[in-house]
Swiss-Prot record:
Extracellular compartment spans: 19-135, 187-214, 276-290, 360-374
PANTHER family cross-referenced by the UniProt entry: GASTRIC INHIBITORY POLYPEPTIDE RECEPTOR (PTHR45620:SF5), PDF RECEPTOR-LIKE PROTEIN-RELATED (PTHR45620)
Domain of life: Eukaryota
Organism: Rattus norvegicus
Assembly information from the UniProt record: May form homodimers and heterodimers with GLP1R.
Similarity section: Belongs to the G-protein coupled receptor 2 family.
Official protein name in the record: Gastric inhibitory polypeptide receptor
Cellular component aspect of the GO annotation: plasma membrane
Role: This is a receptor for GIP. The activity of this receptor is mediated by G proteins which activate adenylyl cyclase.
Length: 455
């Protein structure tokens, strides 16, 4: 028995050696750490034996990934891929790049794409293709939204009869959508392209544009936050119209302005401070420390949840109103469906679908499904809102019709020597709708003005 046991132990030991030889690249965590630690020691010894240059230069250092020698200011350093990588044999000919600034300080940017695991390149290329297509989609969506929102904002601003609290809130919402679209499109122009960087000029340009890129990132976060808060203002105001019997809008609009434009600063400013202190890397477009990202994400999720609850509450009110008025609205189910679809983009209800799915949970197909859903609807949301609440709005169409009739009266076109027949302004078919488009504080029956717009 002892001999058999000894032979078994020798066989297992030989098998382990064979596996270690055949799988030399499959290092354990402990082995990888030891190789990384030895690489750092060798780097430190090399730097101590090297005499620093006399001119302005970046100090030699080990940045926890690669060993950087002393480098002259305003140049790009290049070192071979670190040999402690498990796949070093496949990337031995690759290099890591880092920019030394004109002030003799290392830039936060580092390009190690040539040293990445080649086995992941295929999956990376597929993901890159999907992300590039999604970028094209939201670029088209935000550009279209930007154009239509600008036109809608001009229309609501020019016609004085459309000036009321409801449309003032719409105008601020349109502005927030425009700022969001403009900030995202501008940020994309300042961010580096997807995938590996080519050439030695890219780090220099990227380092020079770093401040502008981070500024654009901060403005983007503020504009996105303002967009969500103005969606919340729309929900709060609509709920106020339907529920509160005695309502006075004096002073309320100032509170709405403070909430819409002031609330985002309450979480964007702390995010900027914490990000600068604890994760001041690249253009701040990546959120490696999730706790910092939740400073912005938590208030946005709260606004989404509140708006969804308001949406459910409003639907309940509309159902009860429409059921009590079946004599006037016999097709109330169809009108309820139309009302629901109309309210969804105004309140951003679509955000609830993937709101419970966090960034940590979204992996693989779920991640791309979440990205595609949110990117498509969010980029075209401004376009839908401008169409639903401006271009096909009866009050807006009536004002445009009045303007056209007024212009026709000022510039008559005689036909066959016959004087043109004057058309009174009051003959417009939607004149009654305009007379009813008064500030909501003058309407004494709660919910009637909203219900009439759906019936």
């Amino acid at each position: 028995m002892p001999l058999r046991l000894l032979l078994l132990l020798l066989w297992l030991w030989g098998l382990s050696l064979q596996r270690a030889e055949t799988d030399s690249e499959g290092q354990t965590t402990g082995e990888l750490y030891q190789r990384w630690e030895r690489y750092g020691w060798e780097c430190q010894n090399t730097l101590e034996a090297t005499e620093p240059p006399s001119g302005l230069a970046c100090n030699g250092s080990f940045d926890m990934y690669a060993c950087w020698n002393y480098t002259a200011a305003n140049t790009t350093a290049r070192v071979s891929c670190p040999w402690y990588l498990p796949w070093y044999r496949q990337v031995a000919a690759g290099f890591v790049f880092r920019q030394c600034g004109s002030d003799g300080q290392w830039g936060s940017w580092r390009d190690h794409t040539q040293c990445e695991n080649p086995e992941k390149n295929g999956a990376f290329q597929d993901q890159k293709l999907i992300l590039e297509r999604l970028q094209v989609v939201y670029t088209v969506g935000y550009s279209l939204s930007l154009a239509t929102l600008l036109l809608a904002l001009l229309i609501l601003s020019l016609f004085r009869r459309l000036h009321c609290t409801r449309n003032y809130i719409h105008m601020n919402l349109f502005t927030s959508f425009m700022l969001r679209a403009g900030a995202i499109l501008t940020r994309d122009q300042l961010l580096p392209p997807l995938g590996p960087y080519t050439g030695n000029q890219t780090p220099t340009l990227w380092n020079q544009a770093l401040a502008a890129c981070r500024t654009a990132q901060i403005l983007t976060q503020y504009c996105v936050g303002a967009n969500y808060t103005w969606l919340l203002v729309e929900g709060v105001y609509l709920h106020h119209l339907l529920v509160v019997v005695r309502r006075s809008e004096k002073g309320h609009f100032r509170c709405y302005l403070l909430l819409g434009w002031g609330a985002p600063a309450l979480f964007v400013i702390p995010w900027v401070i914490v990000r600068y202190l604890y994760e001041n890397t690249q253009c701040w477009e990546r959120n490696e420390v999730k706790a910092i990202w939740w400073i912005i994400r938590t208030p946005i999720l709260i606004t989404i949840l509140i708006n969804f609850l308001i949406f459910i509450r409003i639907l309940g009110i509309l159902v009860s109103k429409l059921r009590t008025r079946q004599m006037r609205c016999p097709d109330y189910r169809l009108r309820l469906a139309r009302s629901t679809l109309t309210l969804m983009p105004l309140l951003g209800v679509h955000e609830v679908v993937f709101a419970p799915v966090t960034e940590e949970q979204a992996e693989g197909s779920l991640r791309f499904a979440k990205l595609a859903f949110e990117i498509f609807l969010s980029s075209f949301q401004g376009f839908l809102v401008s169409v639903l609440y401006c271009f096909i709005n009866k009050e807006v169409q009536s004002e445009i019709r009045r303007l056209r009739l007024s212009l026709q009266e000022q510039c008559p076109r005689p036909h066959l020597g016959q004087a043109p027949r004057a058309v009174p302004l009051s003959s417009a078919p939607q004149e009654a709708a305009i007379r009813n488009a008064l500030p909501s504080g003058m309407l004494h029956v709660p919910g009637d003005e909203v219900l009439e717009s759906y019936c």
